[in-house]
Amino acid sequence: MPNEIRQFLHDHGISEVEAIIPDMAGIARGKIMPAAKFAEEEGMRLPESIFLQTVTGDYPSDTSGAMSPTEMDIVLKADPKTVRRVPWAAEPTAQVIHDCFYADGKRVGMAPRGVLRGVLELYAARGWEPIVAPELEFYLVEPNIDADYPLKPPVGRSGRAEPGRQSYSIAAVNEFDPLFDDMYQFCEDQDIEIDTLIHEDGAAQMEINLLHGNALDLADQAFLFKRTAREAALRHKMYATFMAKPHAKEPGSAMHIHQSVVDTKTRKSVFSNPDGSPSALFFSHIAGLQRYLPQAMALLAPNVNSYRRISRFQLSPINVHWGYDNRTAGLRVPASNPESRRIENRIAGADANPYIAIATSLACGYLGMVEGLKPTEPITGSAHDLPLTLPRSLDEATRTLRESEPLARILGAAFITAYTIVKEAEYEVFLQVISSWEREHLLLNV
């Protein structure tokens, strides 16, 4: 066990430790144990099938090509940079995110955090370092204990449920001040650096921006923030949901990813020339996103619900056009100075696994840079007036991803195989559900 972790446990009087890893869906899985036992561990173990568990808790019937037939153990190694308190726990509790390896020391190819590490190593080999800043949208809703009923906005301090369409309203955020006070305190206790909090367009829909920085650290923060928001909401008898489209008549929720690249030696942006103009690498990064994001859609929109958000009638992208300060485009270049020139990927849903989404977005840009791709001309009008070019269902997106050789090469064939097996299994389970729409319109009409 690294000495930094032992010291943290001692200094904070920790009695219990949550050893966690993010699975394919971004769910925290792992083990909880006494701090004394955790400090003695020299390689905790879990079955490798943990990465093949679906969001419903099931497993694919055929896992050939994704894992060993014996379902061997994998070894967990604690990352000392990730040790934090669990501020909502009743007892002094710590949480530590782990990386996953096989017994021979080889990294587990289907582990999402390891996939992001692999992409960052490709950048580092060329003297580059990505800088990212995720924005996460989410809804607050009343507790929903019967999934057959639609979700409802919660009642705030005024005693009224919010009707919606309160973009940037301070008063609408103030309705839930006690919840956000807890959320901010929880985040501060975990070194989750929230830059801003705003009210979005939907009823009780919020957005937080994380302060830009190292891609792996920001993925950790986004992963932990989702858990934190849910815990804070539960304290106030609400749910915080990161579903991409929780309400039929409200906007969906996204995870916008701002990304740039700096030179590891000079720390200057490779997206800008010395005279401040956009560089060739900047345009190639955009071109890589344009070419490969449609192939990677299943990684950014990972659930059947994700595709309800992708609509020209909602405030969400429907294609991979790019533009300067254009929020209708899938790829937006915000107004900035040369040092902070960046690209905002607006395609990923809030339901995406942060490690996978950030790894994917950076991988697509990387491919454009190393292949010297050229982007289309920037769009000046509304991208919603142009054709929808993104996959329209999880089934279509998964098939497209499975056939993408460039993405398998950069993200790892083992990961793509495991991920598509999981998504195919989830889609098959979804097809077994008969919806209320089918009963309403088909029961007596066909």
What residue ranges belong to the model's regions?
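A generic structural motif
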Residues: 23, 101-107, 172, 212-218, ...
